[in-house]
A protein has these predicted regions:
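Dynamic helix-loop-helix/coil hinge segments at AAA+ ATPase domain boundaries and subdomain interfaces
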Residues: 122-151, 377-379
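Conserved ASCE/P-loop NTPase catalytic core
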Residues: 138-312
Length: 436
């Protein structure tokens, strides 16, 4: 798979990366591995052998590298002779690699992509409006019970890739909505393992957020084809995670969360529960959301870079909006979506689905018993049926009997989920934000 935004390199000059950085990466990789075939060097550095050959020849002339005969790896069969050779560093080469590691970056991995080339790549992957339809969105949402006007607003936000503020009581599907949005983000994207700005390296790929896409990978092995990322940051989010993180020991940077979310979705979950006050967190995003660019500092050199801010930002909270945000915040959110409690009818449909999913015979009378005898004025939640049926099945397994819906089993499951001793902790429609 050839990327359309940047060309796979054929010569060293095509990398647009400093020659001494590539030389250092090559020598340190070989010193760390003792010996590698030409094909293995291609794999480790993500580069065609032809791009490395000028540096290898230079290292051989200066006696920093030696050859150890032909490799017997199956992958080298039929390849040119230099690719089939095994390479190692000499004692002088090992000393030179150690000197490089002591003063230069210690990054090891595929060769970084030039930052300007990366900008072309990411911009090519976020163009125009997203192709999201009502039927496709409903299919992605699956069995999640939402009113049509809520679905319409989610669709509008996705088509425009606009900022989104989702609020509502816990347990009604806010997190599920953001997860399902990923299914409609569009075709997979290509991202580099790392990028370089001069002699500074920033690691971009993160296996936590970047899921390898199915199918053929790019010819350019500096890149990886991944599903569009959904980066979720919860109550643990700190402002430092939105800046480049410099590893002083290994002398390279880790990309911040919003960079890793580029061309995807960045979700601020549990908004209002972070240590940083909500308005201060919002202020960090005002310029990026409005200008579509973010400014980041390379702390080791003092340089500043301008990064395209091409992720869709979603703020999600189960705290009371009236006590959490102000008019200025809401003005900057393109879409404000309240996810309410399910109606009794929707609650019944969810209960039926959970019974089918968990292998319990459904009884229509169970809905009336739950609503009239157990819930009373207690607010319904979309997550309750799953928990109730799971507890019912647990207790049936404990008694070694088949699970069934009855007043007794429903009452036991209800008490397990909502022990009366918890009082208002299980009844408050809205939680209050922490005081920062």
């Amino acid at each position: 798979m050839q990327t359309g935004a940047i060309d796979a390199p054929k010569r060293l000059e095509d990398l647009h990366v400093r020659r001494d950085l590539v030389a250092s990466l090559l020598l340190r990789t070989l010193a760390f591995s003792d010996q590698l075939s030409g094909a293995a060097l291609e794999t480790r550095l993500g580069l065609p052998f032809e791009t490395l050959l000028p540096i290898i020849e230079e290292f051989q002339k200066t006696q920093l590298m030696d050859t150890l005969g032909f490799s017997n790896e199956p992958a080298v069969e039929g390849r040119p002779i230099p690719v089939r050779m095994n390479y190692t560093v000499s004692s002088a080469g090992r000393q030179r690699a150690a000197e490089m590691s002591s003063v230069q970056t210690r990054y090891l991995g595929p060769c970084p992509v030039n930052f300007e080339d990366y900008l072309s790549l990411v911009r090519s992957q976020v163009t125009g409006k997203a192709n999201v339809t009502d039927s496709a969105l409903k299919k992605a949402l699956g069995t999640l019970e939402l009113e049509q006007h809520v679905i319409d607003q989610i669709g509008g936000a996705m088509v425009s890739r606009a900022s989104l503020f989702i609020f509502g009581a816990p347990g009604n599907g806010k997190s599920t909505i953001t997860e399902r949005m990923a299914l409609l983000m569009g075709a997979p994207i290509e991202i580099p393992h790392a990028v370089s700005i001069g002699d500074e390296i920033i690691r971009v790929i993160d296996p936590v957020y970047h899921k390898i896409a199915e199918g053929e990978q790019p010819i350019d092995r500096r890149l990886v084809k991944v599903e569009r990322p959904v980066v979720v940051a919860g109550g643990e989010l700190k402002l430092q995670q939105l800046d480049l993180t410099y590893d002083a020991s290994n002398r390279y940077y880790e990309a911040p969360l919003q960079w890793k979310a580029n061309a995807g979705v960045f979700v601020i979950d549990d908004f209002g529960r972070q240590e940083v006050p909500p308005m201060r967190l919002l202020n960090r995003f005002i310029v990026p959301m409005e200008k579509k660019v973010d400014y980041l500092d390379l702390s080791a050199s003092g340089r500043k870079i301008e990064l395209p801010f091409l992720c869709q930002v979603v703020f999600s909270t189960n705290l009371s909006p009236t006590e959490l945000v102000d008019e200025a915040f809401l003005r900057r959110m393109a879409y404000k979506i309240g996810v309410g409690n399910p109606s009794p009818e929707a609650f019944g449909r969810i209960l039926r689905y959970e019974c089918d999913r968990q292998g319990v015979a459904f009884d229509e009378k169970a809905i009336g018993y739950l609503l009239n005898n157990l819930y009373g004025k207690k607010p319904l939640r979309g997550s309750h049926p799953r928990a109730l049926i799971a507890r019912l099945v647990d207790l049936a397994n404990y008694r070694q009997e088949p699970p069934k819906l009855s007043p007794q089993t429903l009452k036991e499951a209800f008490d397990a989920c909502f022990n009366p001793a918890l009082g208002s902790l299980t009844e408050d429609d809205w939680a209050r934000p922490a005081i920062n």
